[in-house]
Amino acid sequence: MALELLAIDLGKRAFHIYGIDTDGVILSRKVSRAKLAEVVGDLEPTAIAMEACASAHYWARCWLAAGREVRLINPRFVKPFVKGSKNDAVDAEAIFEAAMRPTMRFVPVKSTDQQDLQSLHRARDRLICQRTALINHTRGLLAEYGVVLPQGPWRFMAQAPTAIAGADLSDLARAIFGELMGQLDDLDRRIQKLDAMIVTLCRTNETCRRLAKLPGVGPIIATAIVGSVNDGRQFRSGREMAAWIGLVPRQYTTGGKPRLGGIGRRANHYLRRQLIHGARHRQPVGQA
């Protein structure tokens, strides 16, 4: 079959492909993971469309290496084209229809370096969440023994050992809190190790070094931006990028009457959070 466009509904073990050849014959079939590359190679489509979901960037790099055009679509833009109940075949057809729209916006394919950066940031964020949860857990247990510590992870880590040593605790309680503080120290060392890796990567990447010169931007924000948008060529202006991150007001305009609400809060939640933290650090809240 001569296919100009092939849509693939991605999965872990089972995939569904959908396409229409030049004679109008519809191709819709289920393909196993082991056979996907072989089947796509036999069909030789000019372009391949997929949702920008789990493993999409891996497969996109595979198809690009094989000389195919790749169109990654935000799942939110595919949903309006789903007809009837959801299943793999319907999803693949919806991806095909969405990819054919002349005004459709596509997601740039991430390189392995970008995905490495994103994985590093996600691992660091997970460790920070675990540390915060453990601090709150330890703080709550200490309060049951009359030990109240100030807010903030750094003040907690600095004052907790002294407070525990001076508290009237049983041997068992001291052993419990010693174990919890040991876990906190281990998490802190792991976070510092990942921080050092981020600083090293920032120094070796030209785009990161340029971004780090901006006010309120350091290695963490610079590498997070590069990991998410690379050099930003997909945006026509800085405002477009701000809208993509979700930093501009949500708009609901009808009948010629504009309505603006709070920030959109869509897209990359992690990047938006880091940028807001950087802005607050540069200009603390309440200071003009």
Give the ranges of each region predicted by the language model.
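A detector of single, family-specific signature residues
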Residues: 1-288
